[in-house]
Amino acid sequence: MVNTMKTKLLCVLLLCGAVFSLPRQETYRQLARGSRAYGVACKDEITQMTYRRQESWLRPEVRSKRVEHCQCDRGQARCHTVPVNSCSEPRCFNGGTCWQAVYFSDFVCQCPAGYTGKRCEVDTRATCYEGQGVTYRGTWSTAESRVECINWNSSLLTRRTYNGRMPDAFNLGLGNHNYCRNPNGAPKPWCYVIKAGKFTSESCSVPVCSKATCGLRKYKEPQLHSTGGLFTDITSHPWQAAIFAQNRRSSGERFLCGGILISSCWVLTAAHCFQESYLPDQLKVVLGRTYRVKPGEEEQTFKVKKYIVHKEFDDDTYNNDIALLQLKSDSPQCAQESDSVRAICLPEANLQLPDWTECELSGYGKHKSSSPFYSEQLKEGHVRLYPSSRCAPKFLFNKTVTNNMLCAGDTRSGEIYPNVHDACQGDSGGPLVCMNDNHMTLLGIISWGVGCGEKDVPGVYTKVTNYLGWIRDNMHL
């Protein structure tokens, strides 16, 4: 009888997991001077998240592949192991491993070193912010007055404009943490704090990063003119990429599209370049090349780990004409910065340059629409940003123009400037860049047009400011 009872007890422990109270869990009581305590909660020392009484969560065990189900009970987390399977779709960013609970609908991410958060979205090594800090995902949690920030998930913030339980909280960087964020485009990251017994928002003391090297170059004045633009050197456009694809029915490869280096391991391009489906290992990206097929002394070549085409790309209107390629490398860094290879700066979400601002495009495309071949040398063109009123169907032979597009064209004409600068076939996926704050900044991706170099007919580009969230989210997947 005793043996039977022991056997049953052992089965229960194996099936359900041994419930226990972790000594490292601490009771979390937040107090405001002169006010009442507003709730005892549990703080998970592994995930650094706080939970309300009776709230439950999953967490990965340290140094193992097991997962625990925890519940906050009177200030202590009571946990037991539960069975899990690999998630059916990617949910974790920055290389995290996703585990789906077998008996209930919840998942947990096992994060690599340097990342934490529900989806490994928090970068524990981020010590400063860039621009206004809209994309800051670090762990700074102190306001300028040295007061500790309040957790965005706190019930005290339920009626506040921004909190960790609002529908788009995750995209704004909000969640179960008290880290400084900038969900509303303020001048810098901020958080909610309690001062003199009252709630208020306050800017954080997180430092701004030193100015990045993105968008810098050693510009060489073009010496030779060509139909549709000017022959140039890669050092004038070090963010220019060339994408090649293997031939399907013969050996060798063919030039596919242009691309734009936006970080060490990521290249931005146009979605319509992949209307024919390719496997990632059928693609190659070349950086630092002045001549389309002739190798350069400082060029860098990469295989493609994966590529992501916007799910809502419309191959009829070319709406959402954007795609990302992740370069393959044996180390965390892919492209090595040099005079011939450098990332372009991405714009701030609210960047709006004046109408008719002069910008540049570059690519290895055809000289004109009737040309049988692509250009052998990289070319550049100088165009101006059109007002939205001129970026409309009636100026583009009644073709559809959406809010995700912008227009730019060469406004020079006449006998003095018979050569109208414009993008053409083969330039697709390449950059439209403009000077902003002394750095060249990406405004558009070469997408489509009516002919090439037609007088008073602008080229159409994917509007990059509309896709900053999409770019950030997919780079972290």
Curated annotation (Swiss-Prot):
Q: Which SMART domains match?
A: EGF, EGF_CA, FN1, KR, Tryp_SPc
GO molecular function terms listed in the Swiss-Prot or TrEMBL record: calcium ion binding; serine-type endopeptidase activity
Q: Name one GO cellular component term.
A: extracellular space
Which Gene Ontology BP annotations are present?
plasminogen activation; platelet-derived growth factor receptor signaling pathway; smooth muscle cell migration
Compartments in which it is found: Secreted
Annotated Kringle domain residues: 128-209
The EC number(s) attached to this protein equal 3.4.21.68
Gene3D superfamilies hit by this protein:
Complement Module, domain 1, Laminin, Plasminogen Kringle 4, Trypsin-like serine proteases
| Documented activity regulation | Activity toward plasminogen is stimulated in the presence of fibrin I.
Name of one Pfam family that matches: fn1
Keyword Glycoprotein, does the record have it? yes
Checking CDD domains in the record gives: EGF_CA (cd00054), FN1 (cd00061), KR (cd00108), Tryp_SPc (cd00190)
Glycan-carrying positions:
153, 398
Disulfide bond entries: 42-72, 70-79, 87-98, 92-109, 111-120, 128-209, 149-191, 180-204, 214-345, 257-273, 265-334, 359-434, 391-407, 424-452
Q: Which reaction does it catalyse?
A: Specific cleavage of Arg-|-Val bond in plasminogen to form plasmin
Q: Report keywords, A-Z.
A: Disulfide bond, EGF-like domain, Glycoprotein, Hydrolase, Kringle, Plasminogen activation, Protease, Secreted, Serine protease, Signal
What does the record note on quaternary structure?
Monomer.
Quote the entry's note on domains: The fibronectin type-I domain mediates binding to fibrin, and the kringle domain apparently mediates fibrin-induced stimulation of activity.
Which family is this protein grouped under? Belongs to the peptidase S1 family.
Q: What is this protein called?
A: Salivary plasminogen activator alpha 1
Q: What species was this sequence derived from?
A: Desmodus rotundus (Vampire bat)
